[in-house]
Amino acid sequence: MSDILNKIIAVKREEITDAINRKPLPAMRKDAESRVLTRDFVGALRAKIAAGKPAVIAEIKKASPSKGVLRADFIPADIAQSYAEFGAACLSVLTDQQFFQGSIDYLKQARASCSLPVLRKDFIIDAYQVYESRVMGADCILLIAACLDDAQMKTLEALAMSLDMAVLVEVHDEAELERALKLRTPLIGINNRNLNTFEVSLDTTLRLMGKVPAERLLVTESGITTPEDVKRMRDARVNAFLVGEAFMRADEPGVALAELFGE
């Protein structure tokens, strides 16, 4: 793992311990298992693609470690409604507090304000967080291959699916992709950002996509900032996108989405 990931994971372990002290695992599990009716995250993406449209997972992100605060006027419900109005397929909400200034409440507010399925964007390393994700209303969780070994990924995926949540597994290189393809989830996210240098290259997606079987749903993540970037991806038959920073700096995030994707 990169230095930044090691630092983040160390903080996550402390956060999980604190959370368990506040609400023990049996109570969190009971609450998670009593929740009903997730929204169909994979289905929402596939429906857009079937209609010949880009399937956009629009991100709600206040800040990042590399860029600082992206949006001072940050009202998750308003952002979610704007995204929904202008054609997003799904939402992604950052819930990591220390590094991204996110919040569980932001996910709850975003999901309550519209009908789109919602991804919890965080660093999931423990079963407790999976139950917690379901309790807060997440329809999908992110598993980052760089943070987890094969056994952990398999266990966390199985738990999420048992709770009727989808799983987006994120990879950064060929070795991680090979590991991710052992999982059941159709959702394979290729992050174009190098987590060691924070440099972004869309070539990462183009280089790895040929190794992703056709029955999987490839999502390109990070670095999509211009209509030319979108065209380059769509010409290569990449039709699902996770985009955040490009929208967060805009006055009206949904309008920025429509302009970027030509909707």
From Swiss-Prot:
SUPFAM superfamilies from the UniProt entry: Ribulose-phoshate binding barrel (SSF51366)
Single Gene Ontology MF annotation: indole-3-glycerol-phosphate synthase activity
EC numbers for this chain: 4.1.1.48
Top-tier EC class: lyase
Keywords: Amino-acid biosynthesis, Aromatic amino acid biosynthesis, Decarboxylase, Lyase, Tryptophan biosynthesis
Any single GO BP term: L-tryptophan biosynthetic process
Catalytic activity line of the entry: 1-(2-carboxyphenylamino)-1-deoxy-D-ribulose 5-phosphate + H(+) = (1S,2R)-1-C-(indol-3-yl)glycerol 3-phosphate + CO2 + H2O
InterPro entries in alphabetical order: Aldolase_TIM, Indole-3-glycerol_P_synth, Indole-3-glycerol_P_synth_dom, Indole-3-GlycerolPSynthase_CS, RibuloseP-bd_barrel
Pfam (any one): IGPS
Superkingdom assignment: Bacteria
Keyword field contains Amino-acid biosynthesis: yes
Keyword Amino-acid biosynthesis: yes
Pathway listed: Amino-acid biosynthesis; L-tryptophan biosynthesis; L-tryptophan from chorismate: step 4/5
Coiled-coil ranges per UniProt: none
Family: Belongs to the TrpC family.
NCBIfam families: PRK00278.1-2, PRK00278.1-6, PRK00278.2-4
Protein name per its UniProtKB record: Indole-3-glycerol phosphate synthase
